[in-house]
């Protein structure tokens, strides 16, 4: 059984709900929309039918219509877009840094501090308001069949992919579902590593005590926890912090931030996950002031969506994009590159 987490706020929701199951051996023939409605708690049959109409239900790897009759041992996959929002996104003339655009897709470099999606009283100055302006005479960003294919956090900078047609959104959504996209992030984390690379595996769900954050769960303890895998490698070492590259095998909310904290390396300046404290280094007042100056230089989690790779939904061409660090992150990294411990009271 699958239960959608209805408590998720819009900004932290993943764009898609993903579900996969194998039909029991004793299952009698039944329409797939009815079967899924019975097995997916809180999901309407109409929403499931819409997913089928969009080509987002697959049985044994092939798309099926809502009247398909399930059989024992069928492998069912479904990709559900979230329910349409009940408000209108109004155009705002907000500059966008466009990396690539054609008739099917748009790739942008999002600045830190920009909310991706309106919600909870924050209905202006978001990325979708900017997209509504950008598309104003050509596309309606309020159409749920186009738009965001994935999200990044408000205070994370970097690459975002937008679908401009229903066909592109379905095609790209399936790539994210199948983990055939390539995404790497650069992050500055607290502490040093003895290894050069590693993999973190840990299912993620909201923390019961603080619903604004996520934590790693045993999936038997919390059936709503979602599998998450992060591969990391060291890019550059500094005395008390490390620049790492994180490659996502899955794309869960706050995945890198939670996984790095779990292994003892919170992201630098990540207030939500404990990175806004002096966790490593000297006890001198000069060093503490140095860290405070670093926090002031880049007052947000030091995380940047650096690269993005996917197959073009129309041409089949493999696309790859790379974006430069935001200025605040670049200035902070350069500050650590010039770090001189002797001037701060010794090591």
Task: Describe each model-derived feature in a short phrase.
Residues 1-347:
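RNA pseudouridine synthases
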């Amino acid at each position: 059984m699958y239960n959608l987490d209805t408590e998720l706020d819009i900004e932290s929701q993943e764009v898609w709900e993903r579900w996969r199951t194998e039909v029991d051996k004793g299952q009698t023939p039944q329409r797939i929309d009815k079967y899924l409605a019975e097995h997916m708690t809180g999901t309407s049959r109409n929403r499931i039918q819409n997913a089928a109409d969009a080509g987002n239900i697959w049985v044994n790897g092939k798309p099926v219509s809502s009247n398909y009759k399930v059989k024992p041992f069928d492998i069912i996959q479904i990709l559900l877009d979230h329910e349409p929002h009940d408000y209108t996104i109004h155009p705002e003339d907000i500059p966008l840094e466009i990396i690539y655009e054609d008739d099917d897709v748009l790739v942008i470099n999002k600045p830190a501090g920009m909310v991706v999606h309106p919600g909870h009283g924050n209905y202006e100055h978001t990325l979708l308001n900017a997209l509504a302006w950008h598309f104003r005479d050509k596309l309606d960003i309020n159409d749920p069949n186009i738009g965001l294919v994935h999200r990044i956090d408000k205070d994370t900078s970097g690459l975002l992919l937008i679908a401009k047609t229903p066909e592109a959104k379905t095609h790209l959504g399936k790539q994210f579902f199948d983990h055939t996209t390539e995404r790497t992030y650069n992050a500055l984390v607290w502490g040093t590593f003895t290894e050069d690379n590693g993999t973190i595996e840990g299912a993620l769900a909201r923390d019961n005590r603080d619903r604004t954050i996520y934590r790693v769960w045993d999936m038997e303890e919390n059936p709503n926890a979602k599998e998450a895998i992060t591969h990391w490698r060291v890019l550059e070492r500094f005395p008390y912090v490390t620049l790492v590259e994180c490659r996502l095998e899955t794309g869960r909310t706050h995945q890198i931030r939670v996984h790095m904290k779990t292994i003892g390396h919170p992201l630098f300046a990540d207030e939500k996950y404990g990175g806004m404290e002096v966790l490593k280094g000297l006890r001198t007042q000069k060093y503490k002031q140095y860290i405070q100056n670093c926090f002031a230089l880049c007052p947000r989690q030091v995380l940047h969506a650096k690269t993005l790779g996917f197959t073009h939904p129309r041409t089949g061409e493999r696309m790859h994009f790379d974006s430069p660090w935001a200025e605040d992150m670049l200035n902070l990294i350069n500050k650590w590159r010039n770090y001189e411990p002797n001037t701060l009271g010794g090591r």
